[in-house]
Design a protein with these regions (language model features):
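DNA-recognition helix of helix-turn-helix
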Residues: 63, 67, 130-154
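Arg/Lys-rich amphipathic alpha helix in sigma70-family domain 2
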Residues: 46-50, 60-80, 91
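Acidic, proline/glycine-rich intrinsically disordered inter-domain spacer in sigma factors
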Residues: 4, 77-103
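Short, charged helix-capping/linker segments at alpha-helix termini
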Residues: 1-8, 18-36, 45-52, 134
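Pre-recognition alpha-helix immediately N-terminal to the DNA-recognition helix
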Residues: 16, 97-100, 110-111
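A short pre-motif secondary-structure segment
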Residues: 112-116
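Structural recognition of an alpha-helix C-terminal capping motif at a helix-to-coil junction
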Residues: 32-39, 52-64
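C-terminal flanking helix
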Residues: 18, 38, 106, 110, ...
Length: 154
């Protein structure tokens, strides 16, 4: 399968990638991570050999950029107070305590929750993006939700 022009790839996937980044890093830093994501994709695009699952490829790059962003941030203590119930997926990912807590989850759990509830991906696709089994993807989401409901952080 031939690769589409890069601009077409950008146009088709812009919203999904941006939603993921807003949930992963917040509105304030999403624009920078979005630009870094598509610059990295643009550099790698000519070397890409297959055109299957391009959205997954872009979301993987976005996930890596979000993780890089978190690594550059100063570490904050993890709150020990119980968290409110998990917000609906439509909740603004930049203005709730829940989404702040989501961003503090271990990287695979954070990504799994965002892929599932922001990008509405099936577990099969989440497993492919996280390079794990479908059962491990389900477990990552389950464990993350357990932590968000007030279980103690590891």
């Amino acid at each position: 399968m031939r690769l589409p022009p890069f601009q077409e790839l950008l146009d088709r996937n812009r919203e999904a990638v941006y939603r993921f980044l807003v949930a992963a890093v917040g509105h304030q830093d999403a624009d920078d991570c979005f630009q870094e994501t598509f610059l990295a994709a643009l550099r790698a695009y000519p070397r890409l050999e297959r055109a299957d699952n391009l959205r997954g490829w872009l979301l993987t790059i976005a996930r890596n950029k979000a993780l890089d962003h978190h690594r550059r941030q100063p570490q904050h203590p993890i709150p020990t107070d119980p968290l409110p119930e998990v917000a609906a997926p439509a909740a603004d990912p930049d203005h709730t305590e829940v989404w702040t807590a989501v961003r503090r989850l271990p990287p695979k759990q954070m990504s799994a929750v965002i892929y599932r509830f922001v990008n509405d991906l099936p577990y099969r696709d989440i497993a492919r993006l996280l390079d794990c089994t479908e059962e491990a993807a389900r477990r990552n989401v389950h464990e993350a939700l357990k932590k968000l409901r007030g279980a103690t952080y590891e």
